[in-house]
């Protein structure tokens, strides 16, 4: 179990890294590299449903790396994250890409 100090340290770390989310060669490079595999898995799990009628909650969304491709397919996506700067990064990036998340 994580203690309070560890949770605070993790919070501060992710809050500081918020500018890195959309740098495909940055600290979250691996997440960009596996995004297509994650999307394949998610789409396989919902293959019998119309994605345009789905509401998807991305818990721990970070900068919205998975929110955006799901929104592009027509899902109604909500992303939540404990680091406010991550949410800010996700909002800015999705707005710049004309996505409603």
Say what each PLM segment does.
Residues 57, 65-101:
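Class I SAM-dependent methyltransferase SAM/SAH-binding core
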Residues 52-60:
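Conserved class I S-adenosyl-L-methionine
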Residues 1-23:
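N-terminal, positively charged/glycine-rich alpha-helical extensions of SAM-dependent methyltransferases
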Residues 32-52:
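Conserved alpha-helix/loop element of class I SAM-dependent methyltransferases that forms part
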Residues 26-29:
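Class I SAM-dependent methyltransferase Rossmann-like catalytic core
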Residues 7, 32, 80:
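Flexible, glycine- and charge-enriched loops at secondary-structure boundaries
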Residues 40-43, 47, 64, 68, ...:
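Amphipathic, non-transmembrane alpha-helical secondary structure
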């Amino acid at each position: 179990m994580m203690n309070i100090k560890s949770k605070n340290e993790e919070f501060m770390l992710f809050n500081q890294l918020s500018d890195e989310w959309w740098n495909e060669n940055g600290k979250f490079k691996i997440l960009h590299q596996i995004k297509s595999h994650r999307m394949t898995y998610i789409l396989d799990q919902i293959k019998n449903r119309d994605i345009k009628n789905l509401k998807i909650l991305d818990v721990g969304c970070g900068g919205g790396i998975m929110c955006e491709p799901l929104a592009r397919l027509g899902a109604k996506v909500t992303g939540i994250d404990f680091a406010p700067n991550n949410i800010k990064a996700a909002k800015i990036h999705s707005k710049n890409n004309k996505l409603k998340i």
